[in-house]
Amino acid sequence: MLYTRLLRHNSQFTKFSGTSPNLGSKPLFSKGNLYTSLLVTTLYGTGLACLYLESNSLNKSKEQEDPHAIAEDDIVNIVHDAPNRIFKPALDTYQEKELDLQKSDLHKVLHSLTYSDVSQFSIVWGFLIQLSSLIGNSTLGKKSILYKGSVVSVLGFPPLIYMALKLRMKQLEKAGVRFE
């Protein structure tokens, strides 16, 4: 009833006006938004895949271990021989171990990563990128100080994580752990 009254009183109303496309409107998704969404989805997927690999590697190591109690001296060996590390140690000879001591910090940090490290890094970085994109596409716009700050946080996150992982690696090396 109300609908028919609106039809009678509104002379500008035409049939199917709600479904006809407005050709002058701007598309909702630009290429930048598409690439940002693709990057965020990829980072989230990487994080979930690494969580799955972490779970599988730890479950396999628990099945292979003896159920003996762990002594305090064994803790360093467990960290050193962690089954969830991405790059497994493959050094056998003394010369290769000497070459390992001469490698850069970046190489050592990458070889000390576990699946959980990569998972946490990728999920948090994806969240920061998604948040930055959301702020840029909102009413605040890309010229706002909040958007510029979020872009700085997105770009500054990987170096910050590298420094934190490097500090962790140095502390573990002081405790006697060698990263091969």
Swiss-Prot record:
One of the record's GO cellular component terms: mitochondrial membrane
Compartment annotation: Mitochondrion membrane
Residue ranges of the TM segments: 34-54, 121-141, 145-165
Stated induction or repression of this protein's expression: By cell wall perturbation.
This protein's record includes keyword Transmembrane: yes
Keyword Mitochondrion: yes
Keyword annotations of the record: Membrane, Mitochondrion, Transmembrane, Transmembrane helix
Taxonomic superkingdom: Eukaryota
Topology relative to the membrane: Multi-pass membrane protein
Official protein name in the record: Mitochondrial membrane protein FMP33
Lineage, broadest ranks: Eukaryota, Fungi, Dikarya, Ascomycota, Saccharomycotina
The encoding gene: FMP33
